């Protein structure tokens, strides 16, 4: 007999190779694996071993063998009956399938969104054809794949006496909606640093204060190193941290709030002791109040001889900021940012407010937060400064930021050091995003990169569709409809006028408007032209801008168009009041609308006998037409409105002059034109309704 391998022997006797190897080892015969050759002597020994085992079968084994024989006989008989036997089997299978399809009708079904006819039939345990018949009886022509709305689903289910419950499914694509609404267990919440923004008028010492705090309180490990500017930084006071946003104060409120982000916990309002309350101070107060954050007043420049802190306190009481010493609840801290005096006291007050407000977050979850700054770097790609507001962000986390996505490749803290984790209220600069996000975008970390990518792409697509069919902000045209639907309980207004008296008169008159269920709230007033800052505040607060004898500048117009902010311009106070009141009562029906078609800057003036003053102009925007109405604007204030008398290019009369061309203009019955004036051309267009 020739030699045989282990696996061949195992196959021959229907035994596993492993069993053969084990048996050989028990017999003290060494084999390495299933490919080992077995000689005749070893094969004989194995045969003897297995023959002895086969000769002593148990009763159970005998019964099993007999059963197998009987089964095999039955099977062989069945194979002979080819025709009728197979038919019987098919009938048995069909009966079995019918039995499986008979599903008990449930007492209750749940669904989310919509269901197709097929899905509803499956849930109800009915045939789709039966559901289609019922729909037909209701006058609805439907196919098996047609979507049914909630009312139709409830109607069909009630016909079978089945209760319907709609599941509320959280759409992770819209993660902003549930970031703020997530209920955290009290035990999971830990104390977090306060996020502080410094605001105030130009040259009142905001930047100096930031530098003073940074130079005196940054961590010692930074000394001698290169500080990386990431738009935010942390300082440590009495073993507690405070996060400062090193961004233009108003941007921290407006741009971010316009995108639904609330990043600031405390506002430091810097007011110069020698200068008092100025226009931008008032603007800052209105921004902070609109955001609903506590205000600490830092009375700066106390080292100057003309410093008068009592005057500052007195002026701020007019804006409901009453010092604690006078029975109010606003903290006032006298400081000198340039000399570093009072800084420690200011920081202690921040900690005190933080302690009272109890700022907390849950660090044991995936991170959520807001973009502070973002830019494109040639070497690193998209870079974003993120403020973690809840949870902990880690290197390697898949992340969705606004409409962008990626994985956190690297994180750098405020002192330029690489870090692996960032907890609540910590600012970090990250790389790894596919595109540059926008300041104020919300972000969320996810467990799965595939999921993050899918959500990021869906959000980008959604944003594109929203941009195409963009719905405007609150406007007078749809105001009454929104009031009727209960969407509007309060109308936010921003009032700008040419003089303070007009501002006060306009504001007082608007506040007197009395329409049931709706009240007027004036969030900001000011003197002078309507600026971009006014438009951004209006966008963030969903407000309407009312201008009396003032005009928006070019940037304000552009921003108003992009942000869909409604600007209403008037020259008579009672008409402005009438328009707002009519809108609130649903009686607004203007027939014509003014459309500004161009602007020209007066570069030079010429006085000509019997003609008057000729304005040598340069068209800066749009076009000036012969039949358009014009108004003269000086320093943002309208000083005259009338009609064009002549419009010339060189010596020729022309119908219109386009942008970037020079022209000569005379205005009917008006000669007081000066260099630097802006001539604005407008036409009246019929409003389509």
From Swiss-Prot:
Residues 225-229 are annotated as: G2. It comes from the Bacteria. Residues 71-84 have a biased composition (Basic residues). Residues 191-360 form the tr-type G domain. Residues 200-207 are annotated as: G1. Residues 300-303 are annotated as: G4. Keywords: Cytoplasm, GTP-binding, Initiation factor, Nucleotide-binding, Protein biosynthesis. One of its GO terms (molecular function) is translation initiation factor activity. Residues 246-249 are annotated as: G3. Residues 336-338 are annotated as: G5. It is found in: Cytoplasm. One of the essential components for the initiation of protein synthesis. Protects formylmethionyl-tRNA from spontaneous hydrolysis and promotes its binding to the 30S ribosomal subunits. Also involved in the hydrolysis of GTP during the formation of the 70S ribosomal complex. This is Translation initiation factor IF-2. It comes from Bacillus cytotoxicus (strain DSM 22905 / CIP 110041 / 391-98 / NVH 391-98).
């Amino acid at each position: 007999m020739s030699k045989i391998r282990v696996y061949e022997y195992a196959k021959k006797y229907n035994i596993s190779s492993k069993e053969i190897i084990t048996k050989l080892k028990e017999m003290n015969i060494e084999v390495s694996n299933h490919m080992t050759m077995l000689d005749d002597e070893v094969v004989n020994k194995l045969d003897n071993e297995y023959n002895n085992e086969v000769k002593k079968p148990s009763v159970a084994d005998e019964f099993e063998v007999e059963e197998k024989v009987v089964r095999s006989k039955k099977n062989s008989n069945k194979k002979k009956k080819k025709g009728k036997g197979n038919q019987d089997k098919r009938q048995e299978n069909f009966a079995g399938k019918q039995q499986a399809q008979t599903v008990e009708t449930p007492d209750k079904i749940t669904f989310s969104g919509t269901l197709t006819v097929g899905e509803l039939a499956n849930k109800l345990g009915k045939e789709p054809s039966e559901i289609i018949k019922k729909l037909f009886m209701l006058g609805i022509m439907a196919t098996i794949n047609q979507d049914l709305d909630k009312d139709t689903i409830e109607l069909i289910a009630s016909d079978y006496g089945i209760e319907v419950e709609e599941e509320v499914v959280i759409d992770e694509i819209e993660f902003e909606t549930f970031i703020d609404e997530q209920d955290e267990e009290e035990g999971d919440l830990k104390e977090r640093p306060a996020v502080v923004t410094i605001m105030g008028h130009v040259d009142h010492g905001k930047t100096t204060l930031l530098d003073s705090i940074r130079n005196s309180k940054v961590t010692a490990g930074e000394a001698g190193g290169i500080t990386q500017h990431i738009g935010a930084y942390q300082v440590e006071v009495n073993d507690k941290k405070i996060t400062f946003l090193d961004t233009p104060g108003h941007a921290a409120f407006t741009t971010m709030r316009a995108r639904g982000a609330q990043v600031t916990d405390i506002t430091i309002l810097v007011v110069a002791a020698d200068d008092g309350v100025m226009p931008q101070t008032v603007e800052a107060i209105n921004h902070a109040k609109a955001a609903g954050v506590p205000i600490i007043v830092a009375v700066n420049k106390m080292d100057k001889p003309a410093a008068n802190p009592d005057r500052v306190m007195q002026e701020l009481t007019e804006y409901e900021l009453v010092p604690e010493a006078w029975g109010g609840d606003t903290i006032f801290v006298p400081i000198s940012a340039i000399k570093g005096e009072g800084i420690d006291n200011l920081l202690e007050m921040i900690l005190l407010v933080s302690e009272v407000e109890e700022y907390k977050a849950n660090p044991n979850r995936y991170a959520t937060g807001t973009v502070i700054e973002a830019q494109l770097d040639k070497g690193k790609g998209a870079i974003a400064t993120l403020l973690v507001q809840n949870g902990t962000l880690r290197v390697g986390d898949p992340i969705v930021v606004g409409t962008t996505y990626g994985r956190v490749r690297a994180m750098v803290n405020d002192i330029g050091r690489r870090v692996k984790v960032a907890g609540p209220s910590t600012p970090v600069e990250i790389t790894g995003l596919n595109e540059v996000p926008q300041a104020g975008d919300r972000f969320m970390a996810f467990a799965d990169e595939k999921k993050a990518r899918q959500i990021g792409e869906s959000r980008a697509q959604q944003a594109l569709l929203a941009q195409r069919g963009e719905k405007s902000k609150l406007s007078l045209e749809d105001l009454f409809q929104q009031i009727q639907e209960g969407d509007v309980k309060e109308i936010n207004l921003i009032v700008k006028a040419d003089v303070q008296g007009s501002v006060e008169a306009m504001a007082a008159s608007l506040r007197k408007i009395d329409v049931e269920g709706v009240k007027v709230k004036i969030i900001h007033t000011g003197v002078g032209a309507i600026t971009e800052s006014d438009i951004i505040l209006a966008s963030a607060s969903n407000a309407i801008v009312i201008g009396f004898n003032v005009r928006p500048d070019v940037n304000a117009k552009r921003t108003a168009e992009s942000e869909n902010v409604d600007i209403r311009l008037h020259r008579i106070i009672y008409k402005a009041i009438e328009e707002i009141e009519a809108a609130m009562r649903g009686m607004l029906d203007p027939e014509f609308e003014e459309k500004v078609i161009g602007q020209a800057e007066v570069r030079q003036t010429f006085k000509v006998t019997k003609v008057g003053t000729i304005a040598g102009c340069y068209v800066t925007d749009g076009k000036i037409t012969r039949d358009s109405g014009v108004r003269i604007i000086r320093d943002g204030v309208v000083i005259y409105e009338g009609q064009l008398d002549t419009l010339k290019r060189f010596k020729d009369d022309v119908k219109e002059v386009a942008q970037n061309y020079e022209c000569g203009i005379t205005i009917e019955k008006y000669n007081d034109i000066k260099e630097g004036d802006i001539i604005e051309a407008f036409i009246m267009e019929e409003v389509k309704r």
